[in-house]
Amino acid sequence: MTAKKYDAVLACGGFGTRLKEITKDTPKPLYPVAGKSTLERCIQQLEYFDFKNLIITIGYKSKKFLKFIDELNQKYKVDIDIFEEENPLGECGALWVIKDKLCNDFVFINGDLIFSINFKKLSFFHMRLSSKLTLVTHTSDHPDDSDLVSVPNGTLVENIFLKSNNKNSEKNAYLGNSGIFMINKEVLDKLTAPKEKDSKSVFHFIVKKIFELKINIYSYNTTEYIKDMGTKTRFLKVEKDLENNLVYKNNYDFKQKALFVDRDNTLIYCDKDEYILNSLNLKFIDKNI
């Protein structure tokens, strides 16, 4: 029998310190937002895009997760397993422990996100570029406390800007890290697992180290809805967006309005229903509009 391989990892081991005023004694991923937990909303998205096996890394208040996971396994088709940290491993430290159980290319998601993205398009982008590490990026509405990337050619990350003590001086000139990644396992083989005292986020450890090794990192930039609820202000904004049905309508699974105009104000028509990665995918419109 073929061993089960996980195609998605959800990191839920954080303490959620900044949101304690709202969540109290409940871990952030389990706290209901507009009537449903962040964790369950994530699993709904993964099921919709045919993910088969999800592993959730937990640490803080782990017993609360264990009870809830049994309910979710009965409710959804995604097969959900748990990796419980004996000692805090940071956001990404568990990846080296569970590496042999991961698919060659897997999705990594921070557990405090409310999102709706088309994972099939993300996977197509990642595979077409033979990417080893793809960051899902977007225009951040809080760049001063986000990790940022410079992507002048549209896909290849040219530079990274790490926030320090939740501050980043780079502001609006660059794309923000969304907290969703697609990772090839070769990346883990090239790095030594972080020591417990050095445990950091995917961006601050994996992205930083791979960038220093001069291995190509790609940016999948999307206008789809991805927001963390790490502060009270953001939590209330996300809750309001959910109540007003603003989260799912920008998913690329649905047709979006778009207008391509070059620098000479020429309208451009995309000949194929996919990302423009080659000029052959374009054609000029002869008639006046």
State where each predicted segment sits.
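Residue-level recognition of short loop/turn positions
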Residues: 2, 153-154, 264
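Short, small/polar residue-rich loop motifs at catalytic or cofactor-binding pockets
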Residues: 252-256
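Active-site neighborhood of HAD-like aspartate-dependent phosphohydrolases
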Residues: 257-289
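Conserved beta-loop-beta/alpha segment of the NTase-like Rossmann-fold superfamily
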Residues: 65-66, 70-153
